[in-house]
UniProtKB/Swiss-Prot annotation:
GO cellular component, as recorded: cell surface; extracellular region; phosphopyruvate hydratase complex
Family, similarity comment: Belongs to the enolase family.
Cofactor details (free text): Binds a second Mg(2+) ion via substrate during catalysis.
Cofactor: Mg(2+)
PANTHER family (UniProt xref): ENOLASE (PTHR11902:SF1)
Name of the protein: Enolase
Origin organism lineage: Bacteria, Pseudomonadati, Pseudomonadota, Gammaproteobacteria, Legionellales
Length: 422
């Protein structure tokens, strides 16, 4: 299982922007391939996504520099090494880059290589990827957090909250969970049409209508759930990704669609009122990534009622997560492999979270590819929850379809209502 050659290429993501894909070719002829997503709403401390910044090509968004780094330095450094030792490969990649945020080689170049090595290993062993990724954690089929109403940076509309998600916790297994979500998605389209609202979709496949308030969004979802024949609060609960850093300006959080602005305490009260009115199980990035005093207050007041997920807050970084744990901030972490840049560091963040009673949510990015690696990683890590968008657009459904295949192979338990246990 030794590496013969690594080569990369520039491909397009789901937004039509360039991204990188890497092939790790082993001496036995096996080829492991991986491509890297890109976010729109990003944390300031994410690992560096290397772009060319050439205005004459792809408006500066090309990734030929990252491709060159893979084809030259990375290829030379890893040739002849075994893909059986993922930590060693990732350590060498980080040493080769030798920056805190992977800005020399680019986290996109490093991650494409790291994930392609893991896939090459699975193929060489003739085992499913989720099996070779598992490190002894109890594997489960995750509850999908289905983003069927889009706003914020993921849509061209007036909605402030970035993602309104449904979680089919009452399903007996993953295929039924997917069926429930899909049926609600299609009913929601008819509900929107009936009210004269736009049914165009945003970056992650959810509908992106202009509506009057965040409560109206939740009311529309509630109506669709009921009309689809499901029980709100029993079969389905809500999850929100506020992406509050996108709303924060000059000390206040601005809800433009509602013509309101809040300080941290007022916004926490706003969430408390929403939670009392709707079965909301999870709130992601409820406050700005730098508002740690506000986060501490949010966790104290609402942490025993809902899952409080840090995305921009923690950026899948074990060091930052450790700071949050020490200060009692949030109670869950969003896992995005491209925020940190290697599989090994991603695993470190997951383990650190588990060891300290934090939940993990596996996640895609708004600019995705057809790569399904995160579906296998969600199962392998036993995180029990996955965010991979709505129920349309192949870049989103590819992950759901991979989970269906895994479910067929593995007969694993569905996380279901267990994720609500605090």
């Amino acid at each position: 299982m030794h590496i013969h050659k690594i080569q990369a290429r520039e491909i397009l993501d789901s937004r039509g922007n360039p991204t990188i894909e890497a092939d790790v070719i082993l001496e036995n002829g096996i080829i492991g391939r991986a491509s890297v997503p890109s976010g729109a709403s990003t944390g300031s401390r994410e690992a560096c996504e290397l772009r060319d910044n050439d205005p004459k090509r792809y408006a500066g968004k090309g990734v030929q520099k990252a491709v060159k780094h893979v084809n030259e330095e990375i290829n030379q450094a890893l040739q002849g090494l075994s893909v059986s030792d993922q930590e060693n490969l990732d350590r060498i990649l980080c040493q080769l880059d030798n920056t805190e945020n992977k800005s020399h080689l680019g986290a996109n170049a490093i991650l494409a290589t790291s994930l392609a090595c893991a896939r090459a290993r699975a193929l060489s062993l003739n085992q499913p990827l989720y099996m070779t990724l598992n490190q002894g954690d109890m594997m489960t089929m995750p509850v999908p957090m289905m983003n069927i109403l889009n706003g914020g940076a993921h849509a061209d509309n007036n909605v402030d909250i970035q993602e309104f998600m449904i979680m089919p916790i009452g399903a007996p297994d993953f295929p039924v969970a997917l069926q429930m979500g899909t049926e609600i998605f299609h009913v929601l389209k008819s509900v929107l049409k009936k009210q004269g609202l736009n049914t165009a979709v945003g970056d992650e496949g959810g509908f992106a209508p202009n509506i009057q308030s965040n409560r109206q969004a939740l009311d529309l979802l509630s109506e669709a759930i009921e009309k689809a024949g499901f029980r709100l609060g029993e079969d389905i609960v809500f999850a929100l990704d506020v992406a509050a850093s996108e709303l924060f300006n000059e000390g206040f959080y601005h809800m433009s669609s509602e013509n309101q602005k809040f300080d941290s305490h007022q916004l926490i009260e706003y969430y408390a009122n929403l939670i009392s009115s709707y079965p909301i199980a999870s709130i992601e990035d409820g406050l700005d990534e730098k508002d740690w005093s506000g986060w501490k207050q949010l966790t104290t007041l609402l942490g025993n009622k809902v899952q409080l997920v840090g995305d921009d807050l923690f950026v899948t970084n074990p060091k930052i997560l450790q700071e949050g744990i020490a200060q009692g901030i949030a109670n869950a972490i969003l896992i995005k492999v491209n925020q940190i840049g290697t599989l090994s560091e991603t695993r470190q963040a997951i383990k650190l979270a588990y060891d300290n009673g934090y939940r993990c949510v596996m996640s895609h990015r708004s600019g995705e590819t057809e790569d399904t690696f995160i579906a296998d990683l969600a199962v392998a890590s036993g995180c029990g929850q996955i965010k991979t968008g709505s129920l349309c657009r192949t870049d989103r459904t590819a992950k759901y379809n991979q989970l269906l295949r895994i479910n067929e192979l593995a007969s694993l338990p569905y996380a279901g209502k267990n994720i609500l246990k605090r």
